[in-house]
Amino acid sequence: MDGIKYAVFTDKSIRLLGKNQYTSNVESGSTRTEIKHWVELFFGVKVIAMNSHRLPGKGRRMGPIMGQTMHYRRMIITLQPGYSIPPLRKKRT
């Protein structure tokens, strides 16, 4: 399982960094428990809470045919005080 796809940097997610909460998009079929264990093992941190929501796909037009992109899941991970995750940066091309 890949776990986290990439970190999300929006106005809200940057504001949540001050509360030791990290926002990222994760695999759509993964559960909270899987992501929690993956984050704790990979980053060596203690997770105290996780909030998740599924964002809908967007409509995309391909000529006369209207298509739909895949939905995705976003997790807000709250860590215990004293722990932090280095920023997950997406490679710019």
UniProtKB/Swiss-Prot annotation:
Gene3D superfamilies: 3.30.70.330
GO function term, MF aspect, one: structural constituent of ribosome
Compartments reported by the entry: Plastid, Chloroplast
Record-linked Pfam families: Ribosomal_L23
UniProt cross-references to InterPro entries, sorted A to Z: Nucleotide-bd_a/b_plait_sf, Ribosomal_uL23-like, Ribosomal_uL23/eL15/eS24_sf, Ribosomal_uL23_CS
Single biological process term from Gene Ontology: translation
Keyword annotations from UniProtKB, A to Z: Chloroplast, Plastid, Ribonucleoprotein, Ribosomal protein, RNA-binding, rRNA-binding
One GO cellular component term: ribosome
Family, similarity comment: Belongs to the universal ribosomal protein uL23 family.
Subunit structure: Part of the 50S ribosomal subunit.
Function: Binds to 23S rRNA.
Descriptive protein name: Large ribosomal subunit protein uL23cz/uL23cy
Organism field: Daucus carota (Wild carrot)
